[in-house]
């Protein structure tokens, strides 16, 4: 609270206290409030002693902060009531007034309760009561209070009463009987409750006296109060209109409530309604505690001359709440009789009805009503009920299906006729009987067809004969039927009318939330014409559809209808304009708190009180969460039960106070049961699979029930404790559920660290993590958990993933995880999580809570080798603090060909982080620590909105089934209310029913529909549709639907205005969107022309149970590089943003690609599909109209390599193989690839084929182009970089600009080879690294070298379940595909794609020097590359010529494009040519490469070679001689492999103590050796038989697999050797540390020995010191009688004492002694400073010999026997100050009761001992005496 607010609060409180003190006795004066608003006062308490039969009283002073519990404990001590008790009684404190009492809650403040009496100057008492006491039988009749017999003491003694006592006893019995009869007539007092007797007993036994009251002068106070109230009311009368007669007095009788009080007079205005008069009357009669809603005022008409008490001939009518009694009384004609008003309890079965007033049980006749029923409450003619024609001029009652209402009340058809029904009988037929009658003509209409009777507010229709066809709501009737507003009447076969009762609808407009919006109406009854059909277009009644009802009883009325004027009554006018009547209704409507019968829930529940516990237990304790269809059924049932307890249907005999207590008890019982269930769920075996389901189920129900109770205007005020407990339960269930899901996630977390090289079926995969998350999300949605809770829960799960991975990175340096390789793997796996979060609308939570691990992996994979990288690192990894950055960089494991990270770079990065991230953390109050906190430091927040009650209408599906078993067993009964508005928020606080009804009057029927309304919308696109869509499957739906997530401001949809969030898009331009995926739907929507026709199901999301989808946050975030040509940022949402921007995609009218070009891809394997969905979900090119590629194919054409879908996720495969399109001449590489590390061992041709390793050539191999015969051509398109990329490296801008400008000049598709920045390490929080593999053929790959360019090879997985993953750093690339054949078709095509815009968030601009260095390196590389390209040109030309000739011959040759001979020059993936070579489409080279040592067998499954590839694979050596030489080498290599296997097997077999790993390896080697032997035999046979090429291919594949496995094993050995070296180094470090520890330990031992020696010397010194002390003492005692002696001898000083230097201040305290050398000399004190130390009195005289004078240093350095002399006495104050200055801080806390030995032992152990001296009392007195001299 602000200071100003607190001051204002204090001032108000002070005024209240001042008023209290002015009226109360001085004893009970209350103090003024403190700054904390606390005050004190004296209170009187009474104690009812049941055993003694009397009351005791005590006054105690109480604070405003003292609770009831505190006061009870104090009073229990004061009254001592439990002296005789054997058990501990339970006490309660009651606030007692004359009118009743109530028990105080435990946490109420009694003094505050007493101060509240100030409001009405009430008097009261506080009574302490033992709840365990039984009521003594007939205690009231036993003895009088003045002569109480102690029944608790003497129970069997019965003495004879005297005459006087007998008389008094009889008198008391008579009084008791009278009181009992009073209580029977006043059920409000709750005569069945013991508490109701307490007030009577207190005031009977302790009558009002000056002793028992608090008010000082009650008569004066009450008189003053009445005077003030009267003056205030009179002022109101005068100020209303100035007339003196606008108010007056009215007598209110209460014969049934207070028969002994004739009447009370109240002051009323003529405009005060009856409900106000009720409240005033109750206060007058002393019943102010009662609920006014339970009482009413009835006007009783007595015959003229009759007395009030004479009830014969009296006619009683209960006034409605808004009628004005005084106005009625003044307008009452005196000749009609006497009018009196009675206050009475509202009958439990009474239902207020409009104009249904009973006079002796008979309805009034029309004439009586016209003459005498108005009483000043005349209504305008517009208030009369009427019939409105539905089908004028059509003779078809379905004609209203398509009309709509205009503002003036007319409609689009012929003008409908409207007939007012006067207060009499209206005849209907072909004949005109009088002005009242309605004349109709047509088939089936009889001359006197039927009668419409309007009496007592009830309108009935009665057919006149069996032939008169009369239908009510489609059902033919033959007898009198009562009409309800909204019903349809049909006369004959063609006349259809709607019956409307404005009075009844006026009540509905006041008391319903949504009016007709939710009314079920008669739509459930077969054969009835659906009212909702009519209301499609809006009601003729000023566009407001009105509810219908099938009930046979009128449910509500508002006030007595007045008789119209005589002229009005006799006429039936067809009226067209109805807006005046609507305005009148709006003016007259008046909000009421009382919920009338029509203002009820869609259903209610009834249960017997005897089975209450069983009923609640069945709902809560025995509900199986997995079998409940509507998961929130318990909540809705419990809420209905609460409302039932609060209603008069539940025990109508009890008082409102008791009803409130009952409701509180029921709610508390519910909450307690729910608490037990949630705790029990958590305590059961955690292995049960349904524990998460049960927790989510009860978390959802607890939160929904809490919302119901909080919002309910009646329950919210009385269930505060239950609300607190429920809120705690929601949080508890949330915590348990988070723990449960985190435990499950923890089992699969190793999937993030799954090495793609080690394929193990047992280990968890990332699919398991995604499955866990998906299961959690579907569980929460199934349980209808609030969206805000869902987001909080997944924030916890994302944080757990972040924490687990990050802590593994930074705390396990030996694991090798801090490497480029693992950084890429973890980042790739995190991409799956982010893609999943994006699909679920949780991308913000994922971005936030995965940020640290994402930035850590980005750090591992980005450039960090030169000082220029420092700004990039710090700006990218801004969330990592200095400790975390230091750990990641220092523990970084470099790849074999990767440069080391400079130490100064690490220091600079850490220094920057200390000034930024560390300071930011400290300013937020967080510690800078290495590890991530396991707990997410965010508070749990209960959602304010988004609950089901806002969207659930009527009885939810599944609720009836949930209750059926309970209903069948008789526990309860479900009562649907068809007349209800259908909303569950009917009793909520602040629900504005009328305005809601008025606002919704054009959409009233929608929630009644089983299916949403379908409309057709035509949009004219400007720069896009302006829609954000999302795909989802609703409840009961088999197929996905496309829903509008949001409408972009300013877009075409926004301008049109008909589309809104929650609408379902059914089709676009006639093509259905139902069942399509989100990306597919986006494709269809982007391929539309400038005019789009959409078929829309309005608010389909709500109808299909997807309302929470609209509640999920979709903030507008500017995406960094996701800009269109216009440069405008695009809003970000869960769905697509559908844009069609001409800057990128051509004009909107650009020719559309044919439908056949957009073949839909097949289902992708799990991860690929998920990644593809994510890719399409994030922003990308396939949401825009792409111009046809130069090859004439759409970029969406399916194919192995041509299916490019996404933002920087790269290209994902489809499983289908389609004929290839023509290759694009201008492929644009995807901007982000995974990093790959390649090992380039030295080979014979390395100096010719590859740069030396120190040169770090800055190039990148582009994805390989395939021949026409390959699976598919690559069509790589430029994509805008993903919106999540935060920045691009500095090289990117210059490189891209240079390369793209080169593309404008050249048609060389290889020019991308030097655009290193196109594969920069984009540092994004959501960047995907798992891509690229699906965009190329299975044999293709990407290579890159140079600093920061170590790409982890993306393994190409042809298998359906394969996931694109990085390959090991030191494995060779798979064999390259053959060079593509390119014809001249593509030559000369210029670059026509626009350049991508510069990124929005760039790093610092590159300096000119860096740019120049980059250019120089590039030019050197290009020069080197020119020579290589020239050689390639020649090779290629020769190859092409030979291929045509020798194609068949080459098929029979077993060629291996990437054979693994360590001796031969091997083919390497080709490198594209430089930019300087025009007129080339693709130029690549094959670079020989010496093979690394090992390769995994699994890696070879990616090396699939087709016949065409084999035929063109050996392009550089097509002649047979080279081929023969190579085949010989292969044979030698195979033999060499077998020999190596044999050797290794022999070594392992000879090894005696093999480890488990070695045994496993031996087994694998044996299998491999056998396989190799069989392979050699098979190959020999193959060569002999000269088999077909296919067998050769198989043999080569087998050889490749064998060689790969062999090399993988060798690599494993190398890795193990590396690990052994690491372990050796670790051991050396540990040995060194151990040696240092030993040295330190020896040093400490030496110091200890020295200290021991010192201690022995000290003991000798202290013994001498003690002897000297005794001598001084004796001498001092001797000199006591000689005060003129100049001084006292000092204790001996150490031998090495030196006087302090003159320069040092005499009072300066010496330095404290060293902890580990207490006996080392530090500083020797002067005699003064030694002797003036503080002394501490010690009471034991026997301890004198232990006295040790201790100075500040406790003589830590003293040793010796030199004695000093006392020069002169000093002033006591000077000594004291010096001794205090010399005292060490903290020394006062040491123990002073130690013996000398103990102090010596502490010294020897190096511990500090107190500086205070332990002195005897005598010595202390002596010293004080000496000091005063």
Curated annotation (Swiss-Prot):
Phosphothreonine sites (modified residues): 1218, 1239, 1337
Domain PDZ as annotated: residue spans: 1014-1100
Principal subcellular localisation of the protein: other
Pfam short name (any one): DIL
PTM-bearing positions, type N6-acetyllysine: 1812
Sequence positions bearing Phosphoserine: 216, 246, 256, 391, 424, 512, 557, 562, 589, 655, 1090, 1114, 1133, 1147, 1150, 1179-1180, 1189, 1206, 1245, 1282, 1335, 1506, 1517, 1701, 1726, 1779, 1804
Annotated keywords: Acetylation, Cell adhesion, Cell junction, Coiled coil, Phosphoprotein, Repeat
Tissue specificity as recorded in UniProt: Isoform 1 is widely expressed, including in heart, brain, spleen, lung, liver, skeletal muscle, kidney and testis. Isoform 2 is mainly expressed in the brain.
Subcellular location: Cell junction, Adherens junction
Positions with biased composition (Basic residues): 160-172
Residue spans of biased composition, Low complexity class: 1316-1325, 1401-1412
GO annotation, biological process: adherens junction maintenance; bicellular tight junction assembly; brain morphogenesis; cell-cell adhesion mediated by cadherin; cerebral cortex development; dendrite arborization; establishment of endothelial intestinal barrier; establishment of protein localization to plasma membrane
Keyword Cytoplasm belongs to the record: no
Pro residues bias spans: 1371-1380
Region of interest (Disordered), ranges: 129-196, 356-377, 539-595, 1114-1230, 1300-1533, 1574-1724, 1742-1829
Annotated InterPro entries: Afadin, CBD_Afadin, Dilute_dom, FHA_dom, PDZ, PDZ_sf, RA_dom, SMAD_FHA_dom_sf
Ranges where the Dilute domain occurs: 668-915
A GO molecular function held by the record: LIM domain binding
A single cellular component GO annotation: cytosol
Subunit structure of this chain's protein: Homodimer. Interacts with F-actin, nectin and NECTIN3. Essential for the association of nectin and E-cadherin. Isoform 2/s-afadin does not interact with F-actin. Interacts with ZO-1 and occludin, but probably in an indirect manner. Interacts with RIT1, RIT2, NRXN1 and BCR. Interacts with ADAM10; the interaction locks ADAM10 at adherens junctions following ADAM10 recruitment to adherens junctions by TSPAN33.
Function noted in UniProt: Belongs to an adhesion system, probably together with the E-cadherin-catenin system, which plays a role in the organization of homotypic, interneuronal and heterotypic cell-cell adherens junctions (AJs). Nectin- and actin-filament-binding protein that connects nectin to the actin cytoskeleton. May play a key role in the organization of epithelial structures of the embryonic ectoderm. Essential for the organization of adherens junctions.
Protein name from the UniProt record: Afadin
